[in-house]
Amino acid sequence: MKEYSTKDIRNVVLIGSAKSGKTTLSEAMLFEGKVIARRGTVEDKNTVSDNEEIEKINQRSIFATPLYAEFMNTKFNVIDAPGSDDFIGGAVSAFKVCENGILVINAQQGVEVGTDIFARYADKYKLPLIVAVNQLDSEKADWEKTIAEMKETFGHKPIIVQFPVNPGPSFDGFIDVLKMKYYHFKDDNGTREDLDIPANLMDEAETLRQELIEKAAEFDDTLMERFFENGSLTEDEIREGLGKGIRQGGVLPIFCLSGKKDIGVKRLMEFTIKTAISPAETKFVTKDGNEVECNAGNPTSIFIYKTDVEPHLGEVSYFKVMSGHLTEGMDLENAETGDKERLSAIYAVAGAKKEKVSGLQAGEIGCTVKLRAGKTNVTLSQLGSGIAYEYIVFPASKYRCAIKAESQNDETKLGEALSKISAQDPTIIVEYSKELKQTILSGQGEQHINVCKWRLENEFGVKVVMFAPKIPYRETITKVATATYRHKKQSGGAGQFGEVSILICPIVEGVPFTNKFKIDGKDVVLNVKTKEEFDLEWGGRLEFYNCVVGGAIDARFMPAILKGLNDKMTEGPLTGSYARDIRVFVYDGKMHPVDSNEISFILAARNAFKEAFRNAGPKIMEPIYNVEIMTPADYMGACMSDLQNKRALIEGMSSDKGFSVLKARVPLAELYRYSTTLSSLTSGAATFTMEFADYQPVPADVQTKLLAEYAAQEKEEE
């Protein structure tokens, strides 16, 4: 493969809902670029893009796969991104390295929730889009409905460049109002006839052409003047105006195609090459806020957007050349570690195929192998240049489960395997919770986690069990209570003795501090000698006040008392959960000149706290999440009813671009496998986000149940 200059490169990500036909479209693009002589199909499990075994088993894209074709003297790099919300991380990483997107819409389904989600991501990353209405050869293809939904969702941006002739099983061509031609296809291999527009379609073509001209003129004052002067624009002028509109995010040009029959694919590629953005037009923002122009004259830098482990190659780092000219054997500096990395081999990538190349210009996408620290989000740059690019920010997790090896002997092996998988897929989060004493695996949905399980068992040979994780409850109090506890132990020689009297009260936001209380029926003012305040790592506060007078307890034992309190804060008296938002006053006690020591006061403080806590109106608190659901309106009732059964507090409903949006506060305990539940309720048509909000007291019946479960567990462990 020859080296292409930056201006002759186009980087395009294919995005859209699952089953919109992106992989089939990518296969047709490779066929048009003569990369392959015969197109594969998802059903036959022989596409270039879906080359991983798990993708063949599921017959869907799971990973974002880089591909390329050499077409019209241009390097046409394509990343086929997964359409399922569960695998959104692959699409997000592709947004970082592509200047253009093709939004693929299934003509049978029209604009789906997933369509809107991907369009929003593209808008967030300022990624210009071209729209490809695919599967126009399908029995239920509905062009008019799809266009109407696009206008409802995207407002004034959609503009028709092509419209189909005979949509449905007999679909064999379209009218292109930019070219003012009728493109007729004689077979399923993209063989095209360029014909005059039939008389019965000319009025529609001329109307749409005029709309296209007016839209193109909107984005350039000079073109607007020409339009007013001449009443029309040339094909090149229309393309120029559309190009500016695409760059400004103000227009969505709509194309017709059937990826399966290779109808319209070549024309889509032609338009993309002539109109879309080349890397030479772009600048990339570094961590320190500077901009680096994507050209060969700047210091060489690459950004790693994806990592993988592949048979016979080991660890593979996929990158974009952000600036400069990358050559085989070049030494670059790792922006994270400062270490030098040598790129002993570089490759152009088309699915599983890696073609070794001697160099890649700025703007190119490629891969290398066996870097020491070539992880996702790492910048490698010319020695001394100091270039480090902003990280990809991946979406928050929406699914969590606990995981353990089937055999305890495999726990170490499991940990190593999970570490490798999470390095390859940053949307897989693995953490060991000291609080829950469980390994928690988080991802985008149950399908995402199931793929992780498949990889663990088939690629790493570790059989695993996945199950509902424990909930990180919190414990607190609602009123004042006191307790005195004496720890005394005699066993010959020096014994143990420590007595502590404490008062505890809740810390409530907005309620001022007080040191006036009623103890044993008497009004008492506790004089504070010293105080310590702690922001707890699990949330909330602990305030510790030494109010002991008359030398009842030496100051040297106060740290031991505080340690005893902290011990019980990390293992609350009700369910063993972390305690929070408690103010503790140590106001009296006793000590022994010989037997008192640190351990005595640690134990006395722990037991005094436990006793006082149980008398202070103790409450269990649960984590609450803000949940936002986007769904077709037909499913709103089912979604709301389901949430109400999950103890949710509905906060609002609204309409957004043709979809219904439901906002609610939901206990985490009710959200296990919610992505699966929502998919079942809506036939996979809805999506949701969840974000931690705060902690709230559980209802009385839930607290009773949790206390009983904890008591049974304690008894079982005795």
Task: Give the positions of each predicted feature.
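Structural and coupling elements of P-loop NTPases
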Residues: M1-E718
